[in-house]
């Protein structure tokens, strides 16, 4: 069985954070179709862990119309060349003010592979020291707090934490820390 082949591609929309493109495709059986894809820069997600607690941020997520707890994460479209570890350091410092002595890569995530090309790296940050956050204007409502492992697991199981990347990152942490 072959793969879907891109025959042509056109940009439908672009802004600083994303590109929406529509591709003409040929399926393995030869039939033609279209596929819409959201292209976004690579992101980094950081699991801040002080040995007993996890650092989470809470912010209003406009698309779902609610505040959400999640691990610090983000992209830097103007720094697309940035290595994932550097991006992780930047996001941690920017969103929480935290600095880490060590960043361990736990794995890679595909955000929504049925509609987006975006991929991200998950890093475990340890050796944490406090500092001042440097949040972007869009993050002005963000707050951060520390939670025990039991609290994080309860927040996930009760639906308080619903961010798929955060839940997947916690799963990677659990697999690495058996």
Feature names for model-found ranges:
Residues 38, 44-90, 138:
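Conserved Nudix-box catalytic region and its N-terminal flanking loop in Nudix hydrolases
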